Swiss-Prot record:
Protein's UniProt name: HTH-type transcriptional regulator SgrR
Annotated ranges, domain HTH marR-type: 1-116
Gene3D superfamilies listed in its UniProt record: Periplasmic binding protein-like II
Stored Pfam families: SBP_bac_5, SgrR_N
Entry keyword Transcription: yes
Amino acid sequence: MPSARLQQQFIRLWQCCEGKSQDTTLNELAALLSCSRRHMRTLLNTMQDRGWLTWEAEVGRGKRSRLTFLYTGLALQQQRAEDLLEQDRIDQLVQLVGDKATVRQMLVSHLGRSFRQGRHILRVLYYRPLRNLLPGSALRRSETHIARQIFSSLTRINEENGELEADIAHHWQQISPLHWRFFLRPGVHFHHGRELEMDDVIASLKRINTLPLYSHITDIVSPTPWTLDIHLTQPDRWLPLLLGQVPAMILPCEWETLSNFASHPIGTGPYAVIRNSTNQLKIQAFDDFFGYRALIDEVNVWVLPEIADEPAGGLMLKGPQGEKKEIESRLEEGCYYLLFDSRTHRGANQQVRDWVSYVLSPTNLVYFAEEQYQQLWFPAYGLLPRWHHARTIKSEKPAGLESLTLTFYQDHSEHRVIAGIMQQILASHQVTLEIKEISYDQWHEGEIESDIWLNSANFTLPLDFSLFAHLCEVPLLQHCIPIDWQADAARWRNGEMNLANWCQQLVASKAMVPLIHHWLIIQGQRSMRGLRMNTLGWFDFKSAWFAPPDP
């Protein structure tokens, strides 16, 4: 019998007997474990060989045998739990231990660096599963970061300085305002072993043609081997950066036929997905990666939903006891914000917008927040920390305003905290706030209506590119804000848009109301090198490494 199964049987037997040695019979024990008398005898003999108990059998009708426990079920359970932790079997660990507080304590004690069989392993604790990693779909902040570790694109954007770099394409040139040419590397391999072909690249770029920022791509052809020509309907100075975004990452052309591709995707990036469940995401360095091989061999993201109720202060990479910690922090490039829905009567009413933005001002929200959140929140007066576009102007409550509807996407604890503060403030003004939580996909598509939406945005470098690109990619915003998005996109592509003025107009009309900038924090280990926090609150796994202990 496998060791894990035998351990489970012993723990069950120990629990049924309340850990007490006793006189009993094979029949009674077999009934406790719901097995045959013969199998029970085999179990007892095997457990005795392991030194867990002694079984002194007595022969004869009515005779009772002596069962003596030499090992406690708790000790064996702890040993089994340690084995499961080392094997990263978090789903089985949860089933074994049951108690969530105990599971959490065990997980936290094993966070950070691990060195096993010559491999460097990094363990991170996160509050929710990362089940959808499909480029081009609605991806949240953390999924966006993970996708960048799994996939490659024609170009890539340096997370630290926002500069454009080569990726699958080693060079590119603009032939004319409507014609770009990219030169691709040969010998690039997917995680499942197949070599990248030009058909994969063409199919990947054609599949995103329905997205607003890629809709001006009219034709994609390969005139010669490893050469790609892209033709446009309008000039686009940002095209090389667009092709480095997550939606434009390269998938195998057969991706739709591969099982569970969204949760177990296959790319050409530095890490390959090994496991992705509700309890754990495990990615492993790809030895055949065409760039520099990742220095951390394996990254395990352990999922513990219970930490969602704590202030989202960032990632904790706790190391061994006594090891000094390094803390890196930055104010996010983005903010939580209110979005008024012009499709509803109250959302479109300028008096309602003025009054709500006055009573739910950033300073009011921070003032009514608990201290643990006040330490992480900074009042926002623009979409970026450096902008001061919003002005708090006293406004009178509109006559007849008795209720409002606020909607946000689920699995985000701070949304609930902020919404609760808003509900409290509005109630003091005799206005009922009805709160709705929907899925992220529903939020992203924005097909349902709500007076107000509570959203958050994190913009990546370079900001003059990503800010408009991010807002334009969210259908919800286009439903709620009745401006000419296509005309604005054309001006943006031509470099004719003053982005600060454009955002200031959105804030001045109260279409968007900035609320809070959040401090992003990584609590790392002193032995970890190359850890540079990006604007998504994560760091590039492939560039980080562990320094050996001091001699």
